[in-house]
Amino acid sequence: YYQYWIGAKVAEGLERPKVEAEFKEHAAEELKHADWLADRIIQLGETPILDPDEWKKQAKCKYEAPSNPDTKVLVEQNLIAERCAIARYQQICDLCQGKDYETFRVSRKILKEELEHEQEMEDFQADFGYYK
């Protein structure tokens, strides 16, 4: 969520209005994913991570601060993050398939959206190439 949200706020450069709008949309979708996951964790009798410091420690996909606000850089950072998320959700789907149907369903739904995000970031990269 935060990587897309803050990226939308600081973006500068090529296709900025389009990148900003897409990042805002992705941020909303990522927050929705977090909501689904928190609900599932609670359904399983566990507690979601409460301390943001723990997010960093336990995250398999790392947050990269948008220290360079250039849209090309931001799109690349988000593409890397999407690919990591895709790999993680695929692993979760593989682990849960035929065993935990609800976690599989939620993970598969998130995976589908992450694949869409990846395509949208790749489309921006193709658009940026047009300006060379």
Which functions belong to the PLM regions below?
Residues 1-132:
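Iron-associated oxidoreductase/ferritin-like identity signal
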